[in-house]
């Protein structure tokens, strides 16, 4: 901070000074500037940041020797100035370990006082506990768990294996869940972990109490109102009754329900998982489920490198962690003087798990009690270059195995292990399971919302680590650790498995998985799958702690005797699950079944039918698929597992069974019946007309094996398996692996630049790059001014580019880029290495460096396998020396993921207390050093003086094992003596330089004039001498298939021509018919038109006549009407006149009458008046 302020003030003063033109004023300002510089320098030199670390980081510092650098580049002066600063040297060493150290060594020790009793999170963060009895929670650390458990096992004097107390809390990480456990005040309802996104009010209350975020994945989005509203409105459990099925509240011992009294648990128990929520919600839900509900493993299986396994039975009834079981206190009591460090007069205890592990494996009593020996396997099989399988490996008699186990249980009940009991129950259930009615066994977290679809690649129970999706280095480290541990585990126990599907395809290029793969696929014979289930199902597999910190739960399906697809709910037989993340390896078993073979096997089946003198139209039936299953089940009814789909339909629809509660409805079989009776007969497989019993007979006879997802392999494709290296550890692959891949994928024939899913494979790097990132690192288009451009692009070659046929469909629109990457010089390779960290792709550079030796090994293996200048026996001897002398030197191509997370957290803490500019300088120095190292490695590989391939033999005079007997051909094979000539004489030389042998695959396109690379992957390498004959057979088969295809195409073409000619003749005839018909129709139409015209004219004439007549009638009628109207008018007028006269007469009469009346009235009035007058006079 001070340095930034100083720089800012400098710029302001200087800019102000430059604007001042008055000379005397400048004279005043100059001393002021100098004074400012002196003050800032003094403050900086006395600040904690001056040394790069604050006081709080002192506890991180281990004792490291100073590192020297002979580099003469620009940073040498800076490096030398750092050498005397121990804290900065620690930062440099820590960063080197974090990015480029794959050796699983801890940078510090784990102790009671500094680690276990120091509270690292929650309301009491920073405080120190007095004893382990005060622990409310603690973070998982393998050093703690291993030390306590190993101490207990070694101090156990029992003569029988003891069942070890167990809690998931001690065997997987609960860091985020511990944050919930640590809180004392905030009370949470059950629905907190079942809403689509966290309730913000509860979340903020938790984080206020914690003093840190509850989770990291997309945490800032909760501050976005629109996003939060949308996230909260998604699906969630709203009904309280439904919620009770999933969750129940836990109360403290005092019964008050306060979280303060809870230890090693949250406030609720998750009883059933609900994954329709966001990842940060589901992570805590799933972790709680593991802690409170997930059943215990039956054992822990401890691997000693890849040599042996120790199996310790576990208590499965009640969960007890290291504190609750008393094992931790026992360890403290036994090791109270294990360290001389003291703090506040308290003795400290160190947890040195590696020392204890070495004592454990060297302890004879431990070996007698816990070392596992599987009589049915041969661990020495893996010492050979080739592993030969037997057809019996693909068969399994379930009924016989059940009888055998029940007899053991009866005779030796005390020695009958929990694994045997579990396996016996599983078999009993499996033999009663119909393929059409099986239930789904494995569940993924596929419904987790807004997680980029990654939930489908996580086991639903063990889903965890919300930041893993955003850290590619940690993600690849997780996958790397998982496959390495599985390979060491199977080798240590003699269990045979091999790489398959996409995992095998990834191996083909560089001996590692494709970077876009999220899991691994392995296959094994059904016999070894059953052994895996019997001895290790429900076991927690532990990696040798000296080699890594992997912990994996082996989960095997309960329907292993079901070997066909059925309803498709159980294509996977077993999973090897990372308990920290839920990532897994898919394991599938191969066996002879009644499944219809795939059409790519048609040619093989036709050849084998001829050899076996069989007719596809007359194949016998076999009950072998269900022969080992019981006919009846416990209720005395027919075992439906013995019925094929049509038999099952007939059984459940019969009158005597259709109402039985045990029998499903026929609607459950609708899709399967459609596949069997409608789709299969129309398919291209040669077996499309066979019933299930015929298919089983044929598949078993021809040694065709398949998994439950209908992936088929012939015995010859698989055996002998090739002992090779994958991710730096021994692994097996199918004998004809390239042939297998061609049947499943569109594998390019040539080893060269390749592209897929916006990634590009560069043979010079033996690495799959993100294409956009690669373009930036090569700067072909000169878009990035600070990154030098490679020189392989020549503008004068546009003509050549336009005429070049580019094999990569993805890059047809990017011919310039593809051409450039097919013409990389060594200078270009150096430049790309330098540009990768400069462009900011640190994870890419880390992966390139850490995997360099592993990918170089695969390159050398390919160079020897496909070299035409070496005889058969020379190849075999060289490959043997490569495997036994070079492979053991390979280190892991990625860092142990737990150590990576641990050191990443240390680096994060360091970054908070150390000046960022200094940190940037440290990382830049490290990058520059490792760029130089990888360029040196690349040059030595290019110029064939790579030290890894220099082998020094034992000079004691002992005969060197060259494994020659592994390649002795059968007596029936015709041998060419030249193939067994060898100029290699290891016994007379003490040194072998493998650099001198094989093809040059460093830059395969440069050695090809057409820039297409080296054609290799169109065929398999010669592994056994019989492969020469098989290669000829394969060529003959290809020739026949080609000829057959050509004949089919010719026939098809002739048929098309014939059809075309017939169609043309038909068309011509149709046109003639049409023309004739049109003429007839025309004539007919004309006649009809003429007739119509005549009829219209006649009709018109008739209408005119009629109209004329109607008009005459109308006129007559009008005259009559007029006359009538006139008469009526006249009559009306007369009547009106008459009426008028009558009214006039009447009026006159009325007037006359009125006049008379008035006169009469007047006369009367006069008379009355006269009378009155006469009366007055009287």
UniProtKB/Swiss-Prot annotation:
Stretches in topological domain Cytoplasmic: 1-27
Lineage: superkingdom: Eukaryota
Region of interest (17 X 8 AA tandem repeats of K-K-K-K-E-E-E-E), ranges: 1042-1174
One GO BP annotation of this record: protein O-linked glycosylation
Motif (DXD): 519-521
Membrane topology, as annotated: Single-pass type II membrane protein
Transmembrane segments: 28-48
Ranges facing Lumenal side: 49-1178
UniProt GO MF annotations: enzyme activator activity
InterPro entries noted in UniProt: FKTN-rel (IPR009644), LicD/FKTN/FKRP_NTP_transf (IPR007074)
Entry keyword annotation includes Cell inner membrane: no
Keywords linked to the UniProt accession: Golgi apparatus, Membrane, Repeat, Signal-anchor, Transmembrane, Transmembrane helix
One protein family per Pfam: LicD
Compartments (UniProt record): Golgi apparatus membrane
Ranges for the Sequence repeats: 1042-1049, 1050-1057, 1058-1065, 1066-1073, 1074-1081, 1082-1089, 1090-1097, 1098-1105, 1106-1113, 1114-1121, 1122-1129, 1130-1137, 1138-1144, 1145-1152, 1153-1160, 1161-1168, 1169-1174
Induction context: Expression is increased at late logarithmic and stationary phases of cell growth. Expression is also induced by osmotic stress.
Use of this protein: Mannosylphosphorylated glycans are found only in fungi, including yeast, and the elimination of mannosylphosphates from glycans is a prerequisite for yeast glycoengineering to produce human-compatible glycoproteins.
Protein family per UniProt: Belongs to the MNN4 family.
Domain notes: The conserved DXD motif is essential for the function, which could be an indication that MNN4 has transferase activity.
PANTHER family per the UniProt record, alphabetical: FUKUTIN-RELATED (PTHR15407), RIBITOL-5-PHOSPHATE TRANSFERASE FKTN (PTHR15407:SF28)
Function of the molecule: Golgi apparatus protein involved in N-glycan mannosylphosphorylation. While MNN4 seems to have a regulatory role in N-glycan mannosylphosphorylation, a transferase activity of MNN4 can not be ruled out. Mediates mannosylphosphate transfer in both the core and outer chain portions of N-linked oligosaccharides. Has partially redundant function with MNN14.
Protein name per Swiss-Prot or TrEMBL: Mannosyltransferase regulator 4
Organism: Saccharomyces cerevisiae (strain ATCC 204508 / S288c) (Baker's yeast)
Gene for this chain: MNN4
């Amino acid at each position: 901070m001070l340095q930034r302020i100083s720089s800012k003030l400098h710029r302001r003063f200087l800019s102000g000074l430059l604007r001042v033109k008055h000379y005397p004023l400048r004279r005043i300002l100059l001393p002021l500037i100098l004074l400012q510089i002196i003050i800032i320098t003094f403050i900086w030199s006395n600040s904690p940041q001056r040394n790069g670390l604050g006081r709080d980081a002192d506890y991180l510092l281990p004792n490291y020797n100073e590192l020297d650098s002979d580099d003469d580049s620009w940073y040498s002066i800076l490096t030398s100035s750092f050498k005397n600063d121990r804290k900065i040297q620690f930062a440099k060493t820590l960063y080197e370990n974090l990015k480029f150290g794959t050796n699983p060594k801890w940078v510090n020790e784990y102790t009671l006082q500094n680690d276990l009793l120091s509270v690292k999170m929650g309301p009491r963060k920073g405080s120190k506990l007095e004893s382990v009895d005060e622990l409310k929670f603690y973070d998982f650390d393998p050093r703690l768990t291993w030390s306590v458990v190993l101490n207990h096992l070694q101090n156990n004097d029992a003569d029988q294996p003891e069942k070890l107390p167990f809690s998931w809390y001690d065997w997987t990480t609960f860091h985020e869940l511990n944050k919930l456990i640590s809180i004392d005040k905030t009370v949470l309802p059950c629905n907190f972990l079942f809403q689509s996104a966290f309730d913000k009010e509860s979340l903020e209350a938790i984080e206020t109490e914690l003093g840190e975020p509850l989770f990291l994945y997309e945490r800032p989005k909760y501050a976005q109102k629109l996003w939060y509203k949308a996230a909260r409105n998604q699906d969630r459990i709203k009904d309280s009754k439904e919620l009770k099925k999933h969750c129940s509240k836990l109360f403290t011992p005092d019964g008050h329900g306060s979280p303060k009294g809870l230890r090693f648990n949250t406030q609720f128990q998750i009883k059933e998982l609900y994954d329709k929520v966001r990842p940060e919600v589901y992570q805590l839900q799933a972790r709680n489920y593991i802690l409170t509900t997930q059943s215990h493993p039956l054992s822990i299986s401890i691997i000693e490198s890849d040599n042996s396994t120790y199996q310790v039975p576990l208590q499965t009834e009640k969960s007890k962690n290291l504190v609750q079981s008393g094992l931790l206190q026992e360890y403290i009591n036994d090791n109270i003087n294990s360290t001389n460090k003291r703090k506040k007069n308290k003795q400290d205890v160190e947890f040195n798990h590696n020392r204890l592990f070495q004592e454990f494996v060297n302890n004879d009593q431990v070996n007698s009690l816990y070392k596992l020996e599987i009589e049915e396997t041969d661990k020495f099989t893996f010492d050979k270059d080739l592993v030969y399988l037997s057809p019996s490996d693909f068969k399994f008699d379930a009924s016989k195995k059940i009888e055998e186990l029940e007899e053991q249980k009866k005779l030796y009940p005390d020695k009958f292990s929990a694994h045997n009991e579990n396996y016996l129950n599983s078999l009993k259930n499996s033999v009663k399971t119909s393929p059409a009615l099986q239930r789904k066994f494995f569940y993924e977290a596929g419904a987790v919302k807004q997680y980029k679809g990654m939930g489908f690649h996580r086991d639903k129970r063990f889903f965890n680590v919300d930041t893993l999706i955003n850290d590619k280095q940690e993600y690849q480290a997780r996958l790397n650790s998982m496959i390495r541990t599985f390979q060491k585990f199977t080798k240590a126990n003699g269990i045979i498995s091999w790489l398959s599907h996409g995992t095998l395809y990834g191996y083909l290029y560089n001996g590692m998985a494709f970077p876009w793969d999220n899991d691994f696929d392995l296959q094994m014979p059904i016999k070894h799958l059953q052994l895996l289930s019997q001895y290790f199902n429900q076991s927690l597999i532990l990696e040798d702690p000296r080699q890594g910190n992997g912990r994996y739960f082996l989960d095997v399906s309960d329907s292993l005797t079901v070997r066909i697809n059925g309803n498709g709910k159980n294509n996977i037989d077993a999973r090897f699950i990372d308990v920290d993340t839920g990532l897994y390896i898919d394991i599938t078993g191969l066996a002879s079944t009644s499944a219809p073979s795939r059409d790519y096997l048609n040619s093989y089946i036709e050849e084998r039918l001829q050899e076996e003198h069989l007719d596809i139209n007359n194949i016998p039936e076999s009950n072998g698929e269900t022969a080992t299953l019981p006919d009846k089940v416990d209720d005395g009814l027919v075992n439906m597992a013995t019925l094929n789909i049509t038999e099952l339909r007939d059984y459940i629809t019969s009158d005597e069974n259709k109402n039985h509660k045990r029998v499903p409805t026929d609607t459950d079989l609708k899709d399967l019946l459609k596949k069997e009776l409608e789709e299969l007969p129309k398919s291209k497989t040669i077996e499309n007309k066979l019933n299930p019993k015929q298919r089983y007979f044929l598949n078993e006879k021809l040694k065709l094996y398949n998994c439950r997802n209908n992936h088929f392999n012939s015995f010859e494709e698989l055996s002998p398996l090739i002992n090779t290296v994958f991710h730096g550890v021994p692994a097996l692959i199918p004998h004809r692996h390239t042939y297998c891949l061609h049947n499943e994928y569109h594998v390019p024939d040539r080893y060269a630049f390749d592209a897929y899913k916006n990634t590009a494979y560069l043979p010079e790097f033996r690495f799959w790059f993100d294409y956009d990132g690669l373009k930036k690192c090569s700067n072909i288009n000169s878009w990035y001014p600070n990154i030098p451009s490679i020189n392989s692009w020549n503008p004068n070659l546009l003509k050549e580019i336009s005429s070049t046929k580019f094999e990569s469909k993805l890059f047809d629109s990017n011919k310039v880029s593809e051409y450039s990457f097919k013409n990389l010089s060594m200078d270009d390779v150096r430049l790309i290495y330098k540009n990768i960290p400069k462009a900011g792709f640190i994870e890419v550079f880390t992966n390139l460096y850490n995997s360099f030796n592993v990918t170089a090994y695969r390159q050398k293996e390919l160079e020897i396998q496909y070299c035409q200048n070496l005889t058969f026996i020379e190849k075999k001897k060289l490959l043997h020396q490569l495997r036994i002398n070079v492979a053991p030197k390979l280190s892991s191509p990625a860092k142990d993921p737990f150590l990576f997370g641990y050191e990443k957290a240390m680096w994060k803490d360091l970054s908070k207390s150390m000046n960022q500019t200094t940190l940037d300088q440290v990382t830049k120095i490290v990058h520059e050093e490792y760029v130089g190292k990888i360029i040196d490695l690349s040059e030595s590989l290019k110029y064939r003086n790579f030290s890894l391939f220099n082998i020094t033999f034992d000079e004691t005079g002992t005969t060197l094992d060259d494994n020659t007997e592994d390649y002795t051909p059968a007596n029936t094979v015709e041998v060419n003596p030249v193939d067994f000539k060898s100029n290699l004489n290891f016994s007379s030389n003490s040194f072998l330089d493998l650099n001198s042998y094989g093809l040059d695959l460093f830059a395969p396109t440069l050695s090809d004039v057409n820039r297409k690379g080296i054609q290799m992957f169109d065929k398999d390498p010669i592994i056994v001498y019989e492969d020469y004959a098989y290669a000829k057979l394969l060529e003959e088969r290809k020739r026949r298939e080609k000829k057959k295809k050509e004949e089919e195409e010719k026939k098809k073409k002739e048929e098309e021509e014939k059809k075309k000619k017939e169609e043309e003749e038909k068309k011509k005839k149709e046109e003639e018919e049409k023309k004739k018909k049109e003429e007839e129709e025309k004539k007919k139409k004309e006649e009809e038109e003429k007739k119509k015209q005549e009829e219209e004219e006649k009709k018109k004439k008739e209408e005119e006549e009629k109209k004329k007549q109607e008009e005459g009638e109308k006129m007559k009628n009008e005259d009559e009407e007029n006359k009538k109207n006139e008469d009526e008018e006249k009559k009306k007028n007369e009547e009106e006149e008459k009426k008028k006269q009558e009214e006039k007469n009447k009026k006159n009469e009325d007037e006359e009458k009125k006049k008379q009346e008035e006169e009469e009235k007047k006369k009367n009035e006069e008379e009355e008046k006269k009378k009155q007058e006469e009366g007055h006079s009287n």
